[in-house]
Amino acid sequence: MTRVFLDINVILDVLANREPFADEAEAVLRQVEARAIEGLVAAHTITTLHFLLAKYVGKAKVRKVLTDLLHVVRVVPVDEDRIRHALAMNWTDFEDAVQAACAEKAEAEYLVTRDKRGFKKSPVKIVTPAELLALVL
């Protein structure tokens, strides 16, 4: 099974229905839900999603949404080793470096994001949601 690491922007596109990106991101999550591919997210993605979405939909609803998401994806730890590795990568965007470091540790085949420029030096192959769908469908 193809193992993919999902950047937070892909999840946000679905949960916040951000057009014009939501449809492709949702199609990726449907593939994860159908177990056609294995979806991974960093632990801090869950806390960041809660922070970003709670003010728009309320804490109760965001907890339900995140609980549902956790039935679909596997959470990858963000530990000291990953933080040190991300710091050593010396990227401009530290959060992107942490995502890439987590994807690498989890042995993901692809890191799925709309921000390909932010991941130019990624140790894991970067694809957009559309590119991933073309590969797996």
Ranges and model annotations:
Residues 1-41, 54-64, 121, 130-137:
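Short, well-structured N-terminal submotif of metal-dependent ribonuclease cores
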Residues 3, 72, 101-137:
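Acidic, PIN/NYN-like endoribonuclease modules and their adjacent C-terminal/linker elements
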Residues 10, 45, 82, 99, ...:
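Alpha-helix capping/helix-boundary segments
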Residues 17, 44-45, 65-90:
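Acidic catalytic patch
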Residues 34-39, 74, 107-109:
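Short active-site oxyanion
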Residues 40, 76, 127:
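General small-molecule cofactor/ligand-binding pocket signal
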